[in-house]
Amino acid sequence: ILSFVFLTISLAFTNNNVGKGNVQLALLQYRGGGDWYANKETSIPNLIEFCNRELKMNLNPEQAIVEAGSPEIFNYPFIHMTGHGNVQFSEQEAENLRTYLKSGGFLHIDDNYGMNPYVRPALKKIFPDKDLVELPFNHDIYKQRFPFASGLPKIHEHDGKNPQGFGIIIDGRVVCFYSYE
């Protein structure tokens, strides 16, 4: 559900298609065996339903699936990525994602537990000069329509660690949000 916060932010950069049902959200298909399809039947469909019902957004009700290296990636203002394991991007895929994010796209990565040691090196391949930075609870990303004054809610109860939100920021804009734990 936290994804709608990021969706709202990313859609602020799109044109007037939001109210016409033309904006479609996508699930990122990646290589490496990290089950990119985890929660495929629920994550984005539930987000779309919530945004259309609660935020009156009129998003396209069908999620898309887009490969990291595809030029189709530029058709989607919001891309969701999840999984439990290995993530690999070729040089071409990393370049495509870098261009997408620098051009106004937004990537939300949800650690479905076990993704952390793989997604961090994959992000370094996309942005070798950028680090994931923990976003403090007073960051604007937690102060949207439904504020999270105490930061991320705990979703997975695997190891008792507190949830954390990390971002990659370019020119003051969060282009990637990584919800960990």
Task: Report each predicted region and the residues it spans.
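Aromatic-Pro/Gly-enriched surface loop or interdomain linker
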Residues: F13-F78, T82-G85
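Structured segments of extracytoplasmic/periplasmic soluble domains
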Residues: L47-N58, T82, T99-S103, A122-K130
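Extracytoplasmic/secreted proteins, especially bacterial periplasmic and envelope-associated proteins
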Residues: T42-N46, F50, Q92, N96, ...
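Extracellular/periplasmic catalytic domains that process cell-envelope and extracellular macromolecules
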Residues: N16-G21, P71-N75, L101-K102, K161, ...
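Surface-exposed patches in mature extracellular/periplasmic domains of secreted proteins
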Residues: M57-E67, I109-N112, K130-F137
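Short alpha-beta junction capping motif
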Residues: L25, F78-P117
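An acidic, glycine-rich "communication" segment
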Residues: G32-G33, N116-E181
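Bacterial N-terminal signal peptides
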Residues: I1-S10
